[in-house]
Amino acid sequence: MTRIVLSFDDARFDEYDAIKLASKYGVKCTLNVTTAYVENSAPTDAGDCPAMTKEQVLELYDDGNVEIAGHSHTHVNDFYDIVKGQRILEGWLSTNEKLGFASPHSQLDLNENPLNKFKGANFLYVRKSQFYDKFSPVYRYIRKISRICGFKWPLYITYKNTLANIVEDGYFLHGVPVLLDNSFDQIKYIVNKAIENKTDCLLILHSICKKGHPLEHDLYSWEWEKFEALCVYIHSLEVKGKLKSVLSKDLILK
């Protein structure tokens, strides 16, 4: 059965409400926390969008439908900073369990920081963005045109290899970024194709914006109404036994 993951980056304040909304529909979420943002010891990468509080992060952790994973300390891909953020998270959560890590901007250099380095530092998994292959430069343009024109099939084709490689070598996760001008129908189509082809689906999200939100026009935001429609749709598919809502770690801990 297809497994679907909603993976939120940064721990922005609006993501708290979005994750609570998802939980209302029984949809699980992974929250990748940039610890310095939450501590308010570094300016957020999202500009006018503040971070969650530590108390909100812990409340979500206690929810049962939410996984907490790392996103570095100051939103960079420096290994020392990544480990620092992870250790801070472990302290907040009072856990010795391995936590996953999602790369900021999905720009982790695996030549500089190979996966074995993360395994040795007790990380459960590493997540970047889409699966890269020789067609990736062309796909970038197809995605842009598809988002502007609302094309579903061409957009899906650019992520077909990503869906086929959501879990690479049992450790390295890939996902589909959900961007501002992606329609609900485009994301629904991708989910349906994952079910049709019996693959998993991991969606990467950031701010979920209601009207008047400071980031409602930011590329990495998505509209509240679209997100709620997605949660309703995932719930309906789960009720029908067509997919299962899971956490990022569930893709590893089979």
Language-model-detected regions and their locations in the chain:
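Membrane-proximal basic amphipathic "stem/tether" segments
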Residues: M1, F135-G175, D218
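Boundary/entry segment of secreted carbohydrate-active catalytic domains
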Residues: M1-D14
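Glycan-processing catalytic domains of CAZymes
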Residues: L6-S7, G70, Y80, T162-D169, ...
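Aromatic/hydrophobic pocket-lining residues that form the small-molecule binding cavity
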Residues: E15, T53, D78, I82, ...
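A short acidic, amphipathic alpha-helical/loop segment
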Residues: D17-L21, N113-K117, I190
